[in-house]
């Protein structure tokens, strides 16, 4: 049983290796047992979850995340996994390539907490969440691989070719070049409510206005 589900820590994430050759319901039972056994050791932690070894559908992934959150004090900030072939999304990044210039990219791993700020002369990529009252200012593009609840300024200096993108797109305010939009936040997105159906959204300037579109 111990070899069918293996849990180990890796930097900022919990890696869960799954046996691809046993029934998924057995995986669920074993994972629940192991999470309960490790609950006190893991404690109240905010971390990403990485599933490896087995391709998962959205439904299976959500089921496993539910088992983890229901049986531990883990707050899931992001999910890494291999998608089942039938569930793969064809995301066309070529449409963004003309907007990406060569230059410096600032990578930030973790949660940008309220009151914190990132400033960069190039692009910014956040591997985590951007909390309310936090700010990102970049001369290039800004990509958030998590929940965007803060304020983002891209294309500082008037570059209207820049873009802002996030998996969970809910900023307080965004500025691209010289254009700004506010009042676009309906609620604070909570990373404990994992919705794998959320679409990756991109804000860019079209016809002199900021437009937010789903990237599908």
UniProtKB/Swiss-Prot annotation:
<dbReference type="GO" id="GO:0000917">
    <property type="term" value="P:division septum assembly"/>
</dbReference>
<dbReference type="Pfam" id="PF22642">
    <property type="entry name" value="MinC_N_1"/>
</dbReference>
<dbReference type="InterPro" id="IPR013033">
    <property type="entry name" value="MinC"/>
</dbReference>
<comment type="subunit">
    <text>Interacts with MinD and FtsZ.</text>
</comment>
<dbReference type="GO" id="GO:0000902">
    <property type="term" value="P:cell morphogenesis"/>
</dbReference>
<dbReference type="InterPro" id="IPR036145">
    <property type="entry name" value="MinC_C_sf"/>
</dbReference>
<dbReference type="InterPro" id="IPR016098">
    <property type="entry name" value="CAP/MinC_C"/>
</dbReference>
<keyword id="KW-0717">Septation</keyword>
<comment type="function">
    <text>Cell division inhibitor that blocks the formation of polar Z ring septums. Rapidly oscillates between the poles of the cell to destabilize FtsZ filaments that have formed before they mature into polar Z rings. Prevents FtsZ polymerization.</text>
</comment>
<keyword id="KW-0131">Cell cycle</keyword>
<dbReference type="InterPro" id="IPR005526">
    <property type="entry name" value="Septum_form_inhib_MinC_C"/>
</dbReference>
<dbReference type="Pfam" id="PF03775">
    <property type="entry name" value="MinC_C"/>
</dbReference>
<keyword id="KW-0132">Cell division</keyword>
<comment type="similarity">
    <text>Belongs to the MinC family.</text>
</comment>
<dbReference type="GO" id="GO:1901891">
    <property type="term" value="P:regulation of cell septum assembly"/>
</dbReference>
<protein>
    <recommendedName>
        <fullName>Probable septum site-determining protein MinC</fullName>
    </recommendedName>
</protein>
<dbReference type="InterPro" id="IPR055219">
    <property type="entry name" value="MinC_N_1"/>
</dbReference>
